[in-house]
Amino acid sequence: MSVFRSVLGACVLLGSCASSLALAGGAEGLQRVKVDLVAPPLVHPHEQVVSGPPKVVQFRMSIEEKKMVIDDQGTTLQAMTFNGSMPGPTLVVHEGDYIELTLVNPATNSMPHNVDFHAATGALGGAGLTQVVPGQEVVLRFKADRSGTFVYHCAPQGMVPWHVVSGMNGALMVLPRDGLRDPQGKLLHYDRVYTIGESDLYIPKDKDGHYKDYPDLASSYQDTRAVMRTLTPSHVVFNGRVGALTGANALTSKVGESVLFIHSQANRDSRPHLIGGHGDWVWTTGKFANPPQRNMETWFIPGGSAVAALYTFKQPGTYVYLSHNLIEAMELGALAQIKVEGQWDDDLMTQVKAPGPIVEPKQ
């Protein structure tokens, strides 16, 4: 930990020098575009294929520390979030664009924060140039020089794991300028895109085995850290709470639509699986320069990664998207539903005989 603090401290000092140079580089003279972020599972409107020169794409994110209810039993988490959601918003740009982020830490917060973009080069992914205390904001610009889906997360000195598992993570998608392609170079199109942010949570219990509730972040730290060190999460959830993407909040689609799922896990490995469907095309490392894998039943997310999977729905019904660590999915909460409308195709599946009395075969 002391090594990380020393490196981050040096980067902060270097950051003061770098910022004085304005980090102009190749961004001077490019068109500047402001984008309003939206809360997951939705993703802000964007083009899949672009022409013309790169742009400077401007985003603004505000850090919010708040208490969140994470299950139907009323269990609470003293959360730290980007823009108030867990995960934070998904940012989308194209390869060659410049991302210009204004990161705001309101005076109502109690902690220092920053952001490490796994897509960025230098200064600990930007963490060394973005540390802000309550009442400050900072502007970071970096070039999106490689395509793919990437994690971003908070990484303050000495507190990285706590901030990450308390909600401060999200995804950035850098699309190829000519769009997503299959291994033969054919354009792949999506009709909808959803972000699924998987979080492992570590809620302390009291001596009677009940989850504890804390009045503020500071009072939760030591107990939470003790649970974190067991490496045993109390909850594993999609988008901030058990059931966040089920029932009335289920994702939606229609037969014939292609849906891109961006699934991020900033801390632990995961194994996504779509019950009743597949991954038609899966970028298992989340990097679009690598050819996607075809017809996947279950794919893998290394901790600290975001993965993209594309599927065209062929049958109506309610699908379940989950981590195929079934204990974590069914017992701890890591599952979502997708409700799909359309006409049933008997050629793909049919019930030949309805349930009824057992008929013994004739001899």
From Swiss-Prot:
Cu cation 2 binds at residues 118, 153, 324. It holds the Pfam family Cu-oxidase. Binds 1 Cu(2+) ion. The Cu(2+) ion is held by residues from each of 2 monomers of the trimer. Nitrite is bound to the Cu(2+) ion site. Pseudoazurin is the physiological electron donor for the Cu-NIR in vitro. The keyword Metal-binding applies. GO terms for biological process: denitrification pathway; nitrate assimilation. It is an enzyme of class 1 (oxidoreductase). Keywords: Copper, FAD, Flavoprotein, Metal-binding, Nitrate assimilation, Oxidoreductase, Periplasm, Repeat, Signal. SUPFAM superfamilies: Cupredoxins (SSF49503). Its cofactor is Cu(2+); Cu(+); FAD. Residues 25-193, 194-363 form the Plastocyanin-like domain. Gene3D superfamilies: Cupredoxins - blue copper proteins (2.60.40.420). It is found in: Periplasm. Homotrimer. Belongs to the multicopper oxidase family. This is Copper-containing nitrite reductase. It comes from Pseudomonas chlororaphis (Pseudomonas aureofaciens). The lineage of its organism: Bacteria, Pseudomonadati, Pseudomonadota, Gammaproteobacteria, Pseudomonadales.
